[in-house]
Swiss-Prot record:
It comes from the Bacteria. It comes from Listeria monocytogenes serovar 1/2a (strain ATCC BAA-679 / EGD-e). The lineage of its organism: Bacteria, Bacillati, Bacillota, Bacilli, Bacillales. Belongs to the UPF0237 family. Residues 4-78 form the ACT domain. This is UPF0237 protein lmo0533. Gene3D superfamilies: 3.30.70.260. CDD domains: ACT_1ZPV. Transmembrane segments: none annotated.
Length: 89
């Protein structure tokens, strides 16, 4: 099972490390990542393997949102099938 994670906010030291460490803590593997900084704003999109999580997905979402607050960015995760359904033309 996979999920799409997005991170958006003002660029700051430690965003990638903070997000990566939190994902490892939640037993989430990063499958693919794209990251850029546009005019001082950090943007990152990750494809994640969530098949090994031990918590409910809503709890994972809440913990990642909390980590985003700590890092002063917005972190959003959603199941891949939901992401795909929302972005079909």
């Amino acid at each position: 099972m996979r999920a799409v994670l997005t991170v958006i906010g003002k660029d700051n030291v430690g965003i990638v490390a903070g997000v990566s460490n939190k994902l490892a803590e939640l037993n989430i593997n990063i499958v693919d990542v794209s990251q850029t900084i546009m005019d001082g704003y950090f943007t990152m999109m990750m494809m994640c393997d969530i098949s090994q999580i031990t918590k409910e997905f809503d709890e994972v979402k809440a913990e990642l949102a909390g980590k985003g607050e700590d890092l002063q960015v917005k972190i959003h995760i959603q199941r891949e099938e939901i992401f795909n359904a929302m972005h079909k033309l």
